[in-house]
């Protein structure tokens, strides 16, 4: 079942996609809890996002707490999130390859869930970090995140932010060693002076082993009760986080 809001109406489809005719159309509401036959529908209603402009508008709309992409979008300017928000990429791609800033997708506060799609910075400037958390809590689930930088990482956290990685694939495609300290290109990184927290409860990491923690502060990015195992993923050396 898929629920989404478009043009002031709530659309519900039980077996199709957002491009198929809806089974039920209701007046717009931000939350729903109804029973129809043997089906119960409840929860926040995601707003459909078709462009970077729609994305920006959703961030300033206090009533919008859940969004879903209906196509690939490209982000050039910074998207700054400062509220509770669920972001479902719907299997689509957010491209950061035309980014004009180093932190194009940045969480500053709130509880944010980012899931079900791809964040691609493969051809961005090498100072671009695809996902940044500078405050609040960010959950990453069923994502593929690509960076290609010898200076930065796929995910960066600082200023008291917390990143919880549940699942997904995180790959730094850089061919050179890490610019600042040598070794494998970074996949995860935290600020040295304004520390954040990264907890890995799952995921596949192609680049530096998350068990080795930060390049300067040490520690580990693997959550308590979990471990990192060396694997081969699509012909590449990788590390997979699993329960002990």
Language-model-detected regions and their locations in the chain:
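Surface-exposed, short loops/turns at beta-strand junctions within beta-sandwich domains
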Residues: 18-29
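Leucine-rich solenoid repeat scaffolds
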Residues: 181-244
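Generic recognition of long tandem-repeat/solenoid scaffolds
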Residues: 10-14, 43, 96, 236-244
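Extracellular beta-strand-rich solenoid/capping regions of secreted or surface-exposed proteins
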Residues: 74-86, 95-115, 121-138, 150-152, ...
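Short, exposed coil/turn segments at beta-strand boundaries within extracellular/luminal domains
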Residues: 35-43
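Acidic Gly/Asp/Thr-rich repetitive segments characteristic of extracellular carbohydrate-active
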Residues: 6, 45-70
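Solvent-exposed loop/turn tips at the surfaces of repeat/solenoid architectures
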Residues: 72, 87-92, 99, 110, ...
């Amino acid at each position: 079942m898929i629920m989404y809001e478009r043009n002031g109406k709530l659309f519900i489809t039980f077996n199709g996609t957002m491009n198929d005719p809806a089974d039920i159309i209701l007046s717009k509401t931000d939350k729903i809890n109804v029973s129809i036959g043997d089906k119960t529908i409840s929860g926040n209603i995601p707003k459909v996002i078709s462009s970077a402009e729609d994305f920006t508008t959703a961030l300033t709309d206090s009533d919008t707490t859940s969004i879903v992409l209906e196509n690939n979008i490209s982000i050039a300017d910074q998207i700054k999130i400062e509220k509770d928000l669920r972001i479902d990429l719907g299997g689509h791609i957010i491209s950061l390859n035309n980014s004009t800033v180093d932190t194009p997708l940045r969480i500053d506060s709130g509880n944010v869930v980012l899931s079900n799609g791809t964040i691609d910075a493969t051809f961005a400037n090498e100072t671009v970090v695809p996902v940044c958390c500078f405050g609040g809590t960010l959950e990453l689930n069923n994502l593929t995140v690509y960076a290609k930088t010898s200076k930065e990482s796929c995910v960066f956290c600082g200023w008291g932010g917390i990143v919880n990685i549940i699942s997904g694939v995180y790959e730094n495609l850089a061919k050179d060693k890490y610019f600042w300290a040598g070794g494998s290109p970074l996949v995860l990184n935290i600020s040295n002076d304004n520390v954040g927290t990264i907890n890995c409860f799952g995921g596949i990491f192609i680049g530096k082993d998350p068990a080795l923690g930060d390049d300067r502060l040490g520690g580990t990015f693997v959550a308590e009760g979990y471990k990192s195992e060396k694997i081969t993923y699509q012909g590449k050396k990788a590390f997979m986080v699993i329960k002990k």
